[in-house]
Amino acid sequence: MANRELLLGDEALALGALHAGLSGVYAYPGTPSTEITEYIQNHPLAAERNVHCKWSANEKTAMEEALGMSFCGKRALVCMKHVGMNVAADAFVNSGMTGANGGLVVVAADDPSMHSSQNEQDSRFYGKFAFIPVFEPSTQQETYDMVRYAFDYSERSHIPVLMRLSLIHI
């Protein structure tokens, strides 16, 4: 029987990224996305595999650092809350044109009904605008499976993938 764990959505995404061969995670702290990077930082697999974990100065910087890692052929994850997509918009939209070498997954933790933030925003429109595919899991298991698929898809298509999380962190 397979090992089973009870995880929040953010934790499922972090564990799926680690199991997908993550090389680095870049983020700007902000609920509801902070827990993803914290989980990776504290997981023994990240230390064992020397996964680079960095809190960036802002979301645009995090996006650019993750792009740099991807350009080098490594799998990178960038995490931000929904309003962080506004800050990272320039780098995110242009990444649809510059592409990615290693898998690049951009996580936007949207917050419908303002459960843990100051406003509502639907980040799917950024994906549509930038011609970047958007994956939106609805359960923790889907989140774990989908992030692994997202890295593979990004590498095969040579473009980033946007994963929209909406209240899956609860």
Predicted regions and their residues:
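Conserved anion/nucleotide-ligand pocket segment
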Residues: 144, 151-163
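Thiamine diphosphate
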Residues: 1-148
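Conserved beta-strand positions
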Residues: 27, 163-165
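Conserved small/polar residues in nucleotide/adenosyl-binding loops
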Residues: 168-170
